[in-house]
């Protein structure tokens, strides 16, 4: 049983609508320090939308968010959704909760090194020399230090995603969010990105991962949520859950019958 002091990231009763369509119907998640939580489910189940609600890239319509015991202050926006009440708090929140996107989202006009030092300098106020030294260490750690001075267009998809992970690590986040980080990659490049993610998990990084990689979910994560039509249909230990699914929809999903 988690106590409040154990929990690093908490999302409670998150609802989200697009027009009249409710896409998230009360999803909750509690991640302790060092947890690797995977979100699985078919396309359109709400996985990525929920992940984006955690740092307000999507504004939920109901729910509460807390990071390290600090609640994100929310107020009602004109469209009825919830927005951050305090812009500086949201900026700090997003640095504490770094995101790695499906399509890398590197800045095309910046070199690899410039991509990685941008947030430490301009968001965290780090001295440039310190940011560069840290960036070089991170690029070496993800195996792309030799690409520091090239532009994203000159990189393979796997290299771009590893740079994106280094960029996320550069702000020293408390939690890392991964939105299907391998789905845009050619199959032969998936392994190099999953290896970096496995290494991060081994270091005790807290990670929330939307993924279709069932092997990663089973072997690396310690908690798994199966989403279907905006609800958590089943959650628990991934090894147990993926080997002996309890609900029929998860059984169908794992057998390929639920698209």
Put a short name on every predicted segment.
Residues 226-229, 239-259:
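C-terminal boundary and immediately downstream tail of ABC-type ATPase nucleotide-binding domains
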């Amino acid at each position: 049983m988690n106590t409040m002091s154990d929990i690093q990231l908490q999302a409670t009763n998150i609802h989200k609508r697009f027009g009249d369509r409710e896409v998230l119907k009360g999803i909750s998640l509690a991640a302790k320090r060092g947890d690797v939580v995977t979100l699985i489910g078919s396309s359109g189940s709400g996985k990525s939308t929920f992940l984006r609600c955690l740092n307000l890239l999507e504004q939920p319509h109901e729910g509460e968010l807390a990071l390290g015991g600090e609640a994100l202050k929310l107020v009602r926006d004109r469209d009825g959704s919830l927005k951050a009440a305090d812009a500086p708090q949201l900026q700090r929140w997003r640095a504490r909760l770094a995101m790695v996107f499906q399509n890398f989202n590197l800045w095309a006009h910046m070199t690899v090194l410039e991509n990685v030092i941008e947030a430490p300098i301009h968001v965290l106020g780090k001295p440039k020399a310190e940011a560069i030294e840290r960036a070089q260490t991170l690029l070496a750690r993800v195996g792309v230090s030799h690409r520091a001075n090239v532009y994203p267009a000159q990189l393979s998809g796997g290299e771009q995603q590893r740079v994106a992970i280094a960029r996320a690590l550069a702000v020293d986040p408390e939690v890392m969010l991964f939105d299907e980080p391998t789905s845009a990659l050619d199959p032969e490049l998936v392994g190099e990105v999953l290896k970096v993610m496995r290494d991060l998990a081994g270091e005790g990084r807290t990670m929330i991962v939307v993924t279709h990689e069932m092997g990663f979910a089973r072997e690396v994560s310690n908690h798994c949520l199966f989403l279907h039509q905006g609800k958590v249909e089943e959650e628990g230990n991934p090894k147990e859950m993926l080997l002996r699914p309890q609900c029929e929809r998860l059984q169908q999903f794992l057998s390929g019958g639920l698209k």
